[in-house]
């Protein structure tokens, strides 16, 4: 599948995967891309399959000359599902914001290298973290 004449989906998937362990290929559908990050383990004493994490996820969609995004911060539960939740621990919040900003910057740079912009989706008004100026 080609998203634009210059950017086939297969090449974009390779570029996105090179950004780090964030791309979830199984959750990428057609022109929708899904990234997540399990940033802070809640209880490391549990067996790996029972652990829960604080983290976040980003969803991208292409449009003319750009990708739009929405993101959420929250809990990745032991069932393997994301739930948007308010983070009450300031240390965890700082870690999540730092991780999200770092990924956002790398993603923005990668997209700029192929002459694409990264912008918030038009209906994404409730941004919990300011990602760019």
Swiss-Prot record:
What does UniProt give as GO cellular component? cytoplasm
Q: Which InterPro entries match?
A: Tscrpt_reg_Crl, Tscrpt_reg_Crl_sf
Source domain of life is Bacteria
List the Gene3D superfamilies hit by this protein, alphabetically: Sigma factor-binding protein Crl monomer
One Pfam family recorded for the sequence: Crl
Subcellular location, record wording: Cytoplasm
Kindly state which keywords UniProt assigns to this record, in alphabetical order.
Answer: Activator, Cytoplasm, Transcription, Transcription regulation
Note down the stretches annotated as region Essential for activity.
99-122
> What is any one GO biological process for this UniProt entry?
positive regulation of DNA-templated transcription
Alphabetical list of HAMAP family matching this protein: Crl
- What does the UniProt function comment say about this protein? Binds to the sigma-S subunit of RNA polymerase, activating expression of sigma-S-regulated genes. Stimulates RNA polymerase holoenzyme formation and may bind to several other sigma factors, such as sigma-70 and sigma-32.
Q: Which family does it belong to?
A: Belongs to the Crl family.
**What is the protein's name according to its record?**
Sigma factor-binding protein Crl
Q: Which organism is it from?
A: Yersinia pestis (strain Pestoides F)
């Amino acid at each position: 599948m080609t998203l634009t004449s210059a950017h086939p989906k297969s090449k974009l998937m390779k570029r996105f995967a090179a950004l780090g362990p964030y791309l979830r290929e199984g959750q990428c559908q057609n022109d929708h891309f899904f990234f997540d990050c399990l940033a802070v383990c809640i209880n490391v004493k549990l067996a790996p399959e029972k652990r829960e994490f604080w983290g976040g996820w980003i969803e991208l969609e292409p449009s003319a000359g750009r990708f739009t995004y929405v993101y959420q911060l929250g809990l990745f539960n032991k069932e393997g599902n994301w739930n948007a939740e308010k983070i009450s621990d300031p240390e965890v919040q700082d870690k999540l914001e730092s991780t999200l900003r770092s990924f956002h910057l790398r993603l923005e740079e990668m997209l700029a290298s192929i002459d694409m912009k990264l912008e918030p989706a038009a209906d994404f008004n409730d941004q919990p973290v300011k990602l760019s100026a």
